[in-house]
Amino acid sequence: MMDLGDKINPNLSFLGINCVSFNQSPDILESLHQALPNMALLAYPNSGEVYDTEKKIWLPNSDKLNSWDTVVKQYISSGARIIGGCCRTSPKDIQEISAAVKKYT
């Protein structure tokens, strides 16, 4: 039986998640790490804000479970080598990501 690792192109340098829920991203990345423990991973979650399609506005993430510090620590322990942000991440978010990367690497 072939596992997921046998199906990955050997020329692939990184695999990751992009524009996914801030709250769900650590679990998703950990699942990738479990399936591909030797693959370098990357994580670019969104800010967690939610777009209200009726009002056509972005709403703050009232269900944000963790800080960037906590999430970045989880990413690193799950094999992330590149960490950033996607939709609606702010310069403040990037500063927090950078500080956490420096703290945990």
From Swiss-Prot:
InterPro entries: HCY_dom, HCY_dom_sf. Residues 1-101 form the Hcy-binding domain. It holds the Pfam family S-methyl_trans. GO terms for biological process: methylation. GO terms for molecular function: methyltransferase activity. The keyword Transferase applies. Keywords: Methyltransferase, Transferase. This is Putative uncharacterized protein YMR321C. It comes from Saccharomyces cerevisiae (strain ATCC 204508 / S288c) (Baker's yeast).
